[in-house]
């Protein structure tokens, strides 16, 4: 179901309540990474250039339902003011009479930042009265926070019940376009790269994508659960013993659905989980007892690269190894580079948030792929084929 976006509405003379994702890292009261604030600028500027005023709301951190001074959104408001080149008023709270009066006094072009939503436990509980109080501040609701779209909270889902119109901002629109198009109408060959430590976190994604993709490339520690299920010795590698049957059934399903399901042929082994560990490369049938696999090997990296550069649509979710340690980052960096090269050749390449987004940033290639999703959990649930409450609640186009 297509949703209305900010382009379907004129905000002239309107007070617009906008949910943004300003959950940014802070150090000494200043924002250390403003990528999420920059991401919200196009939607904010659309409202202002139409002649409306905008009331922004967000959460930051996990204050557990009470005010925590270090989790104030004031530093985010200050950074936004610098980026917009205009003042941003900071509200003392997100509900209450003082906030209501501040909102009522706004004029076209004004920007007001509400204080951290999660200073109130009612936000995550999706409390109707709390949602109604938030909704009363504006006339139109814009959701531009994809990172929380999989949560039915007061500011993402609840408010939509009390405003006349709820639309998607540019960021959410972009997510729906790329994640949606990639999974619903992919240009083939369609390759999914799945990594990370555990099968349990990716079961639903695997199940959903097996019917849609041409090839699945699997890396990260979850490969060892597949290997053990096939009878290989995996040494001290991470394994989910309670998921061995599941691993077998996924391998079986891949076979019957005609999907090319590629596991590594070699791995980088370490004698301990440490940057200064001794390392060696081994084929998967020669892993010794006291060693653990912490990355895909060079042969696998080349094989995966080949699949990626020949693809027309690629989705990547989860690293190939412990990329935070340089010794075990080569596999992940090789995949990141392959995605950049595939993009140059015209492929649609989508990075599904979370650790893969961090990895592509470490590789310095975030601008060399089609789209880096801003939501870790949200993009995962989207790839699992689930409807996201924050999106479902928006007005249909």
Swiss-Prot record:
GO terms for biological process: gluconeogenesis; glycolytic process. It holds the Pfam family PGK. Substrate binds at residues 21-23, 36, 59-62, 118, 151. The keyword Protein biosynthesis does not apply. It is an enzyme of class 2 (transferase). Coiled coil: none annotated. GO terms for molecular function: ADP binding; ATP binding; phosphoglycerate kinase activity. Pathway: Carbohydrate degradation; glycolysis; pyruvate from D-glyceraldehyde 3-phosphate: step 2/5. Its EC number is 2.7.2.3. This is Phosphoglycerate kinase. ATP binds at residues 202, 293, 324, 353-356. One of its GO terms (cellular component) is cytosol. The gene is pgk. It catalyses: (2R)-3-phosphoglycerate + ATP = (2R)-3-phospho-glyceroyl phosphate + ADP. Belongs to the phosphoglycerate kinase family. Its main location: cytoplasm. Keywords: ATP-binding, Cytoplasm, Glycolysis, Kinase, Nucleotide-binding, Transferase. Monomer. It comes from the Bacteria. The keyword Transmembrane does not apply. It is found in: Cytoplasm. PROSITE patterns: PGLYCERATE_KINASE (PS00111).
């Amino acid at each position: 179901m297509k949703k209305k976006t900010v382009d379907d509405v004129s905000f002239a003379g309107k007070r617009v309540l906008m949910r943004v994702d300003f959950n940014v890292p802070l150090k000494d009261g200043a924002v250390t990474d403003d990528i999420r604030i920059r991401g919200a600028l196009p939607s904010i500027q659309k409202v202002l250039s139409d002649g409306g005023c905008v009331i922004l709301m967000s959460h930051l951190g996990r204050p557990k339902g009470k005010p925590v001074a270090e989790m104030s959104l004031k530093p985010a408001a200050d950074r936004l003011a610098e980026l917009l080149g205009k003042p941003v008023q900071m509200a003392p709270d997100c509900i209450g009479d003082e906030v209501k009066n501040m909102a009522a006094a706004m004029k076209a072009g004004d920007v007001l930042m509400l204080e951290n939503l999660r200073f109130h436990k009612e936000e995550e509980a999706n409390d109707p009265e709390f949602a109604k109080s938030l909704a009363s501040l504006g006339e139109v609701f814009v959701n531009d926070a994809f990172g929380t779209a999989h949560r039915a909270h007061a500011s993402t889902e609840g408010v939509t019940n009390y405003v006349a119109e709820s639309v998607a901002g540019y960021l959410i629109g972009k997510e729906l376009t790329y994640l949606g198009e990639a999974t619903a109408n992919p240009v083939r060959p369609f390759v999914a790269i799945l990594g990370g430590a555990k099968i349990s976190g990716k079961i639903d994604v695997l199940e959903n994508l097996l019917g849609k993709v041409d090839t699945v490339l699997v890396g990260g520690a979850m490969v060892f659960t597949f290997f053990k299920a096939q009878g290989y010795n995996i040494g001290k590698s991470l394994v989910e013993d309670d998921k061995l049957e599941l691993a077998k059934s996924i391998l079986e399903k891949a076979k019957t659905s005609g999907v090319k399901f590629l596991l590594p042929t070699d791995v980088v082994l370490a004698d301990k989980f440490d940057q200064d560990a001794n390392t060696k490369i081994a084929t998967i049938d020669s892993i010794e007892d006291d060693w653990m696999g912490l990355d895909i090997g060079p042969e696998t990296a080349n094989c995966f690269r080949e699949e990626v550069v020949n693809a027309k649509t690629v989705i990547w979710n989860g690293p190939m190894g412990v990329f935070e340690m340089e010794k075990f980052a080569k596999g992940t960096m090789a995949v990141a580079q392959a995605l950049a090269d595939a993009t140059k050749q015209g492929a649609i390449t989508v990075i599904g948030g979370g650790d893969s987004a961090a990895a592509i940033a470490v590789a310095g290639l975030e601008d060399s792929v089609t789209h880096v999703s801003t939501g870790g959990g949200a993009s995962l649930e989207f790839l699992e084929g689930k409807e996201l409450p924050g999106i479902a609640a928006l007005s249909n186009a």
